[in-house]
Amino acid sequence: LCCPPQXCGPDCASPCC
C-alpha cells in the first residue's frame, strides 16, 4: 500500500492519489 504522503506509483497496490 502506498498513499500520500508516501505518494503513488508502480510500487503501489492501488492508485490512491
Curated annotation (Swiss-Prot):
Chain positions found as 4-hydroxyproline: 4-5, 10, 15
S-S pairs: 2-16, 3-17, 8-12
GO MF term set: toxin activity
Name listed for the protein in its UniProt record: Conotoxin Reg12b
Organ and tissue specificity: Expressed by the venom duct.
Protein keywords: Disulfide bond, Hydroxylation, Secreted, Toxin
UniProt similarity note: Belongs to the conotoxin M superfamily.
Protein origin, superkingdom: Eukaryota
This protein's GO CC annotations: extracellular region
Domain remark from Swiss-Prot or TrEMBL: The cysteine framework is III (CC-C-C-CC).
Subcellular location: Secreted
